[in-house]
Amino acid sequence: MMIIIPNNEIAKHMLTDFFAKHWGTPEMAISSGIFRCDELDGFAAVNESGEIIGCITYTIDGKDCEIISLDSMIENKGIGTALLQQVEEKAKHAHCQRIKLITTNDNVNAIAFYQKRGYQFAAVFPNAVEKARRLKPEIPEVAENGILIRDEILFSKVID
């Protein structure tokens, strides 16, 4: 069993620890800048023990909602989908026109996940991870699946 709650209802140290454990730091670096995920709006999936088992963060800027991070600790249980739906609803209520997000070329699971949920390729930024790596040198060169981490892929979805 899980419940979805806004990140601002969770002790900040729990969010900081979650991102540090899964990303090495609460900072998310993409070519457009560095974001402190533990300080962003978002939602967390929490199990019956109060442990965070998934988290999504986002920003809203005018008519755009940008998802900065989405993590699910247990695959294929609907956690990522439930979190994504929460942000999509929030974006609708904020009168956003689209939701966008960036992932990297090595993240084949995320690429499939977003396409199955109606997100489309909007752009590919070759070698963009080099810029992000200058901001956050901890970004590895090669993913666990053996793919070089090199390009950023922008996905977007128009909000009805």
From Swiss-Prot:
Stored InterPro entries: Acyl_CoA_acyltransferase, GNAT_dom, N-term/lysine_N-AcTrnsfr
Chain ranges passing through the membrane: none
GO MF annotations in UniProt: acyltransferase activity, transferring groups other than amino-acyl groups
Residues in N-acetyltransferase domain copies: 2-140
One Pfam match: Acetyltransf_1
Protein name per UniProt: Uncharacterized protein YdhI
Underlying gene: ydhI
